[in-house]
């Protein structure tokens, strides 16, 4: 997407176009991933090919999060040169999925009877997730905790509750 795109836009695409793709690149996906460091996909299965990944910068990062079938499967992305790959699926490393955040976000909000779930609370959840991986553990196949890591829910809930208090939406 890009600002000013005339077709297939909606309000969220319009907002995203304002904060992403600042160079307003247009064309096919193959055109715009050439030379890119990162691909973030949340759209449709099979959209990204190994040939496209090969045109990206060396050691590219590919987040292929369409679910249940990603834009490209991890083995193909890695074979094409991607250094870090994630999907929305639990059967591959680096699952990026809302299942990591939602239970803890709601637990934290309920614990303080938050009147709203606001941006500071969402950011607190993201920071809590990232803090669970130590620098020693961080590697290409472990950039985010696993969904069933028992630390995830409590860490996210505590961070969200604290952010609710700090942002004034906690009622207890």
Say what each PLM segment does:
Residues 25-79:
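Long hydrophobic segments that form regular secondary structure
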């Amino acid at each position: 997407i890009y600002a000013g795109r005339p077709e297939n836009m909606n309000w969220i695409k319009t907002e995203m176009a304002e904060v992403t793709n600042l160079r307003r690149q247009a064309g096919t996906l193959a055109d715009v991933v050439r030379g890119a460091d990162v691909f973030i996909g949340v759209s449709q299965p099979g959209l990204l090919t190994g040939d496209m990944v090969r045109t990206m910068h060396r050691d590219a990062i590919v987040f292929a999060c369409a679910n249940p079938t990603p834009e490209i499967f991890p083995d193909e992305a890695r074979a094409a040169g991607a250094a870090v790959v994630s999907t929305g699926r639990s059967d591959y490393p680096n699952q990026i999925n809302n299942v990591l955040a939602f239970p803890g976000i709601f637990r934290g909000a309920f614990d303080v009877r938050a009147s709203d779930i606001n941006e500071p609370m969402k950011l607190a959840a993201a920071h809590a997730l990232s803090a669970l991986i130590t620098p020693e553990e961080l590697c290409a196949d472990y950039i985010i905790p696993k969904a069933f890591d028992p630390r995830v829910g409590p860490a996210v809930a505590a961070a969200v509750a604290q952010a609710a208090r700090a942002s004034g939406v906690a009622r207890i």
